[in-house]
């Protein structure tokens, strides 16, 4: 089985490399240390619901496409820098990685496989599976997404569905975004800065 990349994802395989991995990370911080074996079982269950993630990226005659492969997604303890390279041309490997470190469950994914919404739903499913397996005595309820996602939704080309060149551009001058100052790091050097902010204070601004 194979499926084409959506329009927004077509450029990612062409521009990715060791200096720009096109990988993003979502994570969940628990109140307890993560058990790797239980997390693996939770991932196995999640893959049954998200079989489209069990794919490798292949290059066709004219375009890239995703090909289903019977590769097991394996949980790893975090050792690599965040958002390390996942897609390497001619290497038949899955385009995401689940890892853990102390209390944190990480989900990293190559952007051509899914967008932020798909990644968020997958991580929610993964963490829910983990908590149910880790605490059977609590009889935790299984919570389904408010909007049930079908296989068709997971394959949806949102770019084609919602983008239109006919919509007039907004000529109203908007306030410029905040620009970070200082010396830039090279892409291969990634530093993680964690900040805790008050939502109330942000809303007041």
What are these regions (language model features)?
Residues 179-193:
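Short Lys/Arg-rich basic patches
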Residues 1-160, 189-191, 196, 202-204:
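Non-catalytic N-terminal regions of enzymes
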